From Swiss-Prot:
It catalyses: L-serine = D-serine; D-serine = pyruvate + NH4(+); L-serine = pyruvate + NH4(+). This is Serine racemase. The gene is Srr. Mn(2+) binds at residues 210, 214, 216. Expressed in the cerebellum and frontal cortex (at protein level). GO terms for cellular component: apical part of cell; cytoplasm; neuronal cell body. Mg(2+) 1 binds at residue 13. It comes from Rattus norvegicus. The modification Phosphothreonine is found at residue 71.
Length: 333
């Protein structure tokens, strides 16, 4: 594997050993109805059942356990990150296990359920504007004030390696897999998965999926150069609003086979299908992968790519955004 990448497969193997005692081996589920709709065999890697409700605990815990001891003598005074919610929850949980204070920079537009969960795990929340620039500027200020260290949600190598452990599990759970479809925001998960897959079984395709309203990964692949979103994206898939970065881009450029973009309606439809047909309460970000497989663009993929594993990235749903939940009143005691 090219030395220019920020991680190697050895880092993923190390991450697996580092975190396996504290994360769930999440199940892979299937649906005959969704197979019929897609015209392929679909396997759903259910990271919504992971600790803190998303795949993010893998990278966060690997960073806390692996990065921090190598960085400072003893425990750091604090860890800091910026996150739309899931990485913030994961880092807070991981830091709490090690007795380290956590400060999470959260965009004001983040779902309320994710903000409440971060607070419930014991972190201090600091709000920012929804742009990448604002998040990073506020995080740097908090780092200076707390003398903490930054654990970037998707560009930190230890985080990327941790996310790559998903692929190790998939290859064991679905040995005949032909492709993985992964939602992409900052690219940490798809980069870690691509490093792992292309090392162990390079014939397996790795596809990224993202909202057309936040298509920086697609544009970057199209142009052959890193092309971040110019403005904060407007999408229901709040977990993939971040742009890919300097560490994830080279891996995506070289090892991700294609990028599929999907509309907001396609995301909503796919998410609802999973709710109704599989009885899995995924968040819209997790619906992006299925939306891609059901899209017209995906019909260009060879029919030989038959067994497809879709990563259901998380299940932290803001239930108050559903009209019937808003209308429901708590029963009297």
């Amino acid at each position: 594997m090219c030395a220019q990448y920020c991680i190697s497969f050895a880092d993923v193997e190390k991450a697996h050993l580092n975190i396996q005692d504290s994360v769930h081996l999440t199940p892979v589920l299937t649906s005959s109805i969704l197979n019929q709709i897609a015209g392929r065999n679909l396997f759903f890697k259910c990271e919504l059942f992971q600790k803190t409700g998303s795949f993010k605990i893998r990278g966060a815990l690997n960073a806390i356990r692996g990065l921090i001891p190598d960085t400072l003598e003893g425990k750091p005074k604090a860890v800091v990150t910026h996150s739309s919610g899931n990485h913030g929850q994961a880092l807070t949980y991981a830091a709490k296990l090690e007795g380290i204070p956590a400060y999470i920079v959260v965009p004001q537009t983040a779902p309320n359920c994710k903000k409440l969960a971060i607070q419930a795990y014991g972190a201090s929340i600091v709000y920012s504007e929804p742009s990448d620039e604002s998040r990073e500027n506020v995080a740097q200020r908090i780092i200076q004030e707390t003398e903490g260290i930054l654990v970037h949600p998707n560009q930190e190598p230890a985080v990327i390696a941790g996310q790559g452990t998903i692929a190790l599990e998939v290859l064991n759970q679905v040995p005949l897999v032909d492709a993985l479809v992964v939602p992409v925001g900052g690219g940490g998960m798809v980069a870690g998965i691509a490093i792992t897959i292309k090392t162990l079984k390079p014939s397996v395709k790795v596809y990224a999926a993202e909202p057309s309203n936040a298509d920086d990964c697609y544009q970057s692949k199209l142009k052959g150069e890193l092309t971040p979103n110019l403005h904060p994206p407007e999408t229901i898939a709040d977990g993939v609003k971040s742009s890919i970065g300097l560490n994830t881009w080279p891996i995506i450029r070289d090892l991700v086979d294609d990028v599929f973009t999907v509309t907001e309606d396609e995301i909503k439809y796919a998410t609802q299908l999973v709710w109704e047909r599989m009885k899995l309460l995924i968040e819209p970000t997790a619906g992006v992968g299925l939306a891609a497989v059901l899209s017209q663009h995906f019909q260009t993929v060879s029919p030989e790519v038959k067994n497809i594993c879709i990563v259901l990235s998380g299940g932290n749903v803001d239930l108050t955004s559903l009209s019937w939940v808003k209308q429901a009143e708590r029963p009297a005691p």
